Amino acid sequence: DLFRPYAERALRYLAMRGVLEEDLATLVVLGLPGVEELLGEADRLGLLGVLEWALGVADRLGLEVGPSMVLDVLRVVAVHAAAPSSLRLSDDVFVDYVVSSLILPYFAAVAPRVRQKAVLSARQPREVNEVRDMREKIGEWLGAQSLSIRVMEGLLHELPVEV
């Protein structure tokens, strides 16, 4: 499985090595899910599919996101899965938060390159259509009122085109 090594690493990062006397008394220790449970929860939420899609789009745009995006998403899914139900966001709000805060910011790096390409070529770069397609896909998944759509609108306003 593509995401298994990342899930193992994310859980290793979150695992506490021990509680020291200097730690905050209010520190809450959560029972973290196992690798299979983490991947199952990420899949149930649709985030593994979103990650695969985002990695594909990043590749087409020439962006190198590295493993940090995947690790960030899997870490927050692990915490979400471990949290008591009284502290959990609803699934749709949580997914919108993850996409808008942990996935889409990686795509901001495309704006300067697209602006430079537009100036040098005096025409609209193909990346603009890819970003528009991203906005459409996110709108289908998360709805027109989602925070993720607003992030995409902001990214489109950074590009040298009519939105």
Label each residue range with its predicted role:
Residues 1-163:
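C-terminal regulatory/interaction module of P-loop NTP-utilizing enzymes
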